[in-house]
Amino acid sequence: MRVAVTGTPGTGKTTATEAVETALDVIHLNERIREEGLDAGRDEERDSLVADLDAVEAALAGEDDALIESHLAHHVDADRVVVLRCRPDILQERLVDRGEPAAKAAENAEAEALDVVLSEAVAEHGRESVYEIDTTEASPSAVAEAIEAVIDGERAPAVGTVDFTEHL
């Protein structure tokens, strides 16, 4: 089984997946993209690599028992997609605290308020495969437990349970 853990940068994907207890191989997709050159160049304005999603899919071929973590994870084939969410003002604060430029943090906070990643995940995988989890007040261990429940089939798909539109 392939499980994708995705969300806007700053929602807690890396921290949570590092705490997940699972037999699945944990793949930090952004690291793989950098290490294996699975990019199509650099976005100078955002100072980030642009992933070559076809190359990413090819690199992941045969890795069927995996927990794939990245803000891009919802773009790869997966049986279940966990979308981590965080209140936009808290998300923006987290990003600034970790050294992201204020403009980039604000852009990500707006994307979170607009449900960008959630909408993309539902469009690519369908509502029946998407599990929305609010990380705003949750500890990393609680988020990890929620992800484990998705992996184990103990949590029902949920879309639209988190609403941050008042932050627009």
UniProtKB/Swiss-Prot annotation:
Coiled-coil segments: none
Keywords from the named record: ATP-binding, Kinase, Nucleotide-binding, Ribosome biogenesis, rRNA processing, Transferase
Listed EC numbers: 2.7.4.3
Region (NMP): 28-51
Kinase recorded as keyword: yes
Domain of life of the organism encoding this protein: Archaea
Residue segments, region LID: 97-107
GO molecular function term, any single one: ATP binding
Role of this protein: Broad-specificity nucleoside monophosphate (NMP) kinase that catalyzes the reversible transfer of the terminal phosphate group between nucleoside triphosphates and monophosphates. Also has ATPase activity. Involved in the late maturation steps of the 30S ribosomal particles, specifically 16S rRNA maturation. While NMP activity is not required for ribosome maturation, ATPase activity is. Associates transiently with small ribosomal subunit protein uS11. ATP hydrolysis breaks the interaction with uS11.
Protein name: Putative adenylate kinase
Organism: Natronomonas pharaonis (strain ATCC 35678 / DSM 2160 / CIP 103997 / JCM 8858 / NBRC 14720 / NCIMB 2260 / Gabara)
Gene field: adk2
